[in-house]
Protein backbone atom coordinates (compact mmCIF):
# COMPACT_ATOMS: atom_id res chain seq x y z
CA UNK A 1 0.00 0.00 0.00
CA UNK A 2 1.08 3.53 -0.63
CA UNK A 3 2.77 5.76 1.89
CA UNK A 4 -0.30 8.03 1.88
CA UNK A 5 -2.52 5.15 3.08
CA UNK A 6 -0.27 4.60 6.10
CA UNK A 7 -0.21 8.33 6.92
CA UNK A 8 -4.01 8.49 6.80
CA UNK A 9 -4.25 5.30 8.84
CA UNK A 10 -1.90 6.71 11.49
CA UNK A 11 -3.86 9.96 11.69
CA UNK A 12 -7.33 8.41 11.84
CA UNK A 13 -6.65 5.23 13.77
CA UNK A 14 -8.62 2.00 13.44
CA UNK A 15 -11.80 3.31 11.81
CA UNK A 16 -12.87 1.90 8.44
CA UNK A 17 -11.28 3.70 5.49
CA UNK A 18 -12.59 3.95 1.94
CA UNK A 19 -10.00 2.64 -0.54
CA UNK A 20 -9.91 2.54 -4.34
CA UNK A 21 -8.71 -0.90 -5.33
CA UNK A 22 -7.95 -2.32 -8.75
CA UNK A 23 -7.84 -5.95 -9.80
CA UNK A 24 -7.19 -7.89 -12.98
CA UNK A 25 -8.35 -11.33 -14.04
CA UNK A 26 -5.43 -12.54 -16.19
CA UNK A 27 -5.89 -15.43 -18.63
CA UNK A 28 -3.31 -17.43 -20.52
CA UNK A 29 -3.62 -18.99 -23.98
CA UNK A 30 -5.28 -22.08 -22.47
CA UNK A 31 -7.98 -20.00 -20.75
CA UNK A 32 -6.56 -20.53 -17.27
CA UNK A 33 -6.74 -17.73 -14.73
CA UNK A 34 -3.72 -16.46 -12.80
CA UNK A 35 -4.10 -16.34 -9.01
CA UNK A 36 -1.68 -15.54 -6.20
CA UNK A 37 -1.68 -16.93 -2.67
CA UNK A 38 -1.52 -13.93 -0.36
CA UNK A 39 1.14 -13.80 2.35
CA UNK A 40 -1.07 -11.84 4.74
CA UNK A 41 -3.81 -14.47 5.10
CA UNK A 42 -2.96 -17.47 2.87
CA UNK A 43 -6.00 -17.09 0.62
CA UNK A 44 -5.89 -17.17 -3.17
CA UNK A 45 -6.71 -13.95 -5.00
CA UNK A 46 -6.41 -12.18 -8.30
CA UNK A 47 -3.55 -9.70 -8.69
CA UNK A 48 -4.61 -6.30 -7.44
CA UNK A 49 -4.21 -3.60 -4.89
CA UNK A 50 -4.67 0.03 -3.98
CA UNK A 51 -4.23 2.76 -6.56
CA UNK A 52 -1.39 5.18 -5.96
CA UNK A 53 -1.79 8.94 -6.32
CA UNK A 54 -0.89 9.95 -9.88
CA UNK A 55 -1.68 6.49 -11.28
CA UNK A 56 -4.57 5.44 -13.52
CA UNK A 57 -6.63 2.35 -12.75
CA UNK A 58 -5.19 0.64 -15.82
CA UNK A 59 -1.62 1.41 -14.77
CA UNK A 60 -2.37 0.08 -11.30
CA UNK A 61 -3.74 -3.21 -12.66
CA UNK A 62 -0.70 -3.80 -14.86
CA UNK A 63 1.72 -2.80 -12.06
CA UNK A 64 0.06 -5.01 -9.45
CA UNK A 65 0.06 -8.03 -11.77
CA UNK A 66 3.79 -7.62 -12.39
CA UNK A 67 4.67 -6.97 -8.73
CA UNK A 68 2.61 -9.83 -7.34
CA UNK A 69 3.06 -12.51 -10.00
CA UNK A 70 6.06 -11.62 -12.19
CA UNK A 71 3.84 -11.54 -15.30
CA UNK A 72 3.66 -8.66 -17.75
CA UNK A 73 0.02 -8.35 -18.80
CA UNK A 74 -2.20 -6.27 -21.03
CA UNK A 75 -5.75 -5.20 -20.33
CA UNK A 76 -8.34 -6.55 -22.74
CA UNK A 77 -11.64 -5.51 -21.17
CA UNK A 78 -13.27 -3.62 -18.30
CA UNK A 79 -15.04 -6.24 -16.17
CA UNK A 80 -16.92 -3.95 -13.80
CA UNK A 81 -17.09 -1.90 -10.64
CA UNK A 82 -17.78 -3.46 -7.25
CA UNK A 83 -18.93 -1.19 -4.42
CA UNK A 84 -21.28 -3.20 -2.19
CA UNK A 85 -20.43 -1.91 1.32
CA UNK A 86 -20.88 -5.36 2.88
CA UNK A 87 -19.30 -7.60 0.23
CA UNK A 88 -16.43 -5.18 -0.37
CA UNK A 89 -15.57 -4.72 3.31
CA UNK A 90 -12.27 -6.24 4.38
CA UNK A 91 -10.45 -6.66 7.67
CA UNK A 92 -6.68 -7.07 7.49
CA UNK A 93 -4.85 -9.43 9.88
CA UNK A 94 -3.70 -6.38 11.88
CA UNK A 95 -7.35 -5.43 12.51
CA UNK A 96 -7.46 -2.45 10.15
CA UNK A 97 -10.59 -2.31 8.02
CA UNK A 98 -11.35 -0.90 4.58
CA UNK A 99 -14.38 -0.60 2.35
CA UNK A 100 -13.09 -1.15 -1.17
CA UNK A 101 -14.35 0.50 -4.34
CA UNK A 102 -12.96 -2.05 -6.80
CA UNK A 103 -12.36 -1.37 -10.48
CA UNK A 104 -11.97 -4.72 -12.22
CA UNK A 105 -10.30 -5.51 -15.51
CA UNK A 106 -9.68 -8.60 -17.59
CA UNK A 107 -6.41 -9.15 -19.36
CA UNK A 108 -4.03 -11.59 -20.95
CA UNK A 109 -0.60 -12.76 -19.95
CA UNK A 110 2.19 -11.51 -22.21
CA UNK A 111 5.48 -12.61 -20.69
CA UNK A 112 6.86 -14.00 -17.46
CA UNK A 113 9.70 -11.77 -16.27
CA UNK A 114 9.98 -13.02 -12.69
CA UNK A 115 10.80 -11.06 -9.62
CA UNK A 116 9.90 -11.38 -5.98
CA UNK A 117 7.10 -9.84 -3.99
CA UNK A 118 6.51 -10.38 -0.33
CA UNK A 119 2.72 -10.17 -0.76
CA UNK A 120 2.49 -13.49 -2.63
CA UNK A 121 3.52 -16.87 -1.25
CA UNK A 122 3.01 -18.53 -4.62
CA UNK A 123 1.23 -18.09 -7.94
CA UNK A 124 -0.71 -20.57 -10.02
CA UNK A 125 -2.83 -20.97 -13.12
CA UNK A 126 -6.32 -22.42 -12.67
CA UNK A 127 -9.01 -23.47 -15.11
CA UNK A 128 -12.42 -21.88 -14.45
CA UNK A 129 -14.34 -24.09 -12.05
CA UNK A 130 -11.13 -25.52 -10.59
CA UNK A 131 -10.24 -22.64 -8.29
CA UNK A 132 -8.76 -23.38 -4.86
CA UNK A 133 -11.35 -23.60 -2.08
CA UNK A 134 -9.73 -20.86 -0.02
CA UNK A 135 -10.40 -17.94 -2.36
CA UNK A 136 -10.19 -14.48 -0.84
CA UNK A 137 -13.63 -13.27 0.27
CA UNK A 138 -13.61 -10.24 -2.06
CA UNK A 139 -12.46 -12.21 -5.10
CA UNK A 140 -15.00 -15.04 -5.26
CA UNK A 141 -17.92 -12.99 -6.71
CA UNK A 142 -15.60 -11.18 -9.10
CA UNK A 143 -14.15 -14.46 -10.39
CA UNK A 144 -17.67 -15.88 -10.81
CA UNK A 145 -18.61 -12.84 -12.91
CA UNK A 146 -15.43 -13.18 -14.98
CA UNK A 147 -16.13 -16.80 -15.91
CA UNK A 148 -19.83 -16.19 -16.60
CA UNK A 149 -21.32 -15.49 -19.99
CA UNK A 150 -23.27 -12.52 -18.66
CA UNK A 151 -22.90 -9.14 -20.40
CA UNK A 152 -20.24 -6.77 -19.15
CA UNK A 153 -19.56 -4.43 -17.42
CA UNK A 154 -20.89 -5.52 -14.06
CA UNK A 155 -22.06 -2.91 -11.57
CA UNK A 156 -22.28 -4.57 -8.18
PLM segments and residue spans:
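Acidic, metal-coordinating catalytic segment for phosphate/diphosphate chemistry
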Residues: 1-23, 95
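Acidic/histidine-enriched, glycine/proline-rich intrinsically disordered or flexible terminal extensions
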Residues: 5-8, 144-156
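A residue-level structural signature of the nucleotidyltransferase/glycosyltransferase Rossmann-like core
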Residues: 16-17, 32, 43, 123, ...
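Short connector loops at helix/strand junctions that flank enzyme active sites
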Residues: 19, 28, 39-41, 46, ...
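Conserved hydrophobic "DFG−1" position in protein kinase catalytic cores
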Residues: 26-27, 35, 107, 125
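A structure-centric signal for secondary-structure junctions around beta-strands
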Residues: 19-21, 30, 120
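Unchanged
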Residues: 51-77, 82-141, 155-156
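Conserved Nudix-box catalytic region and its N-terminal flanking loop in Nudix hydrolases
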Residues: 28-68
Amino acid sequence: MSEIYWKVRAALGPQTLLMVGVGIIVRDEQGRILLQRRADNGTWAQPGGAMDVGESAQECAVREALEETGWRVEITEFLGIYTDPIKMHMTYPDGNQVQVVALQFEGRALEYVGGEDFEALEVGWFFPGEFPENLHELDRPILMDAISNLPRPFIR
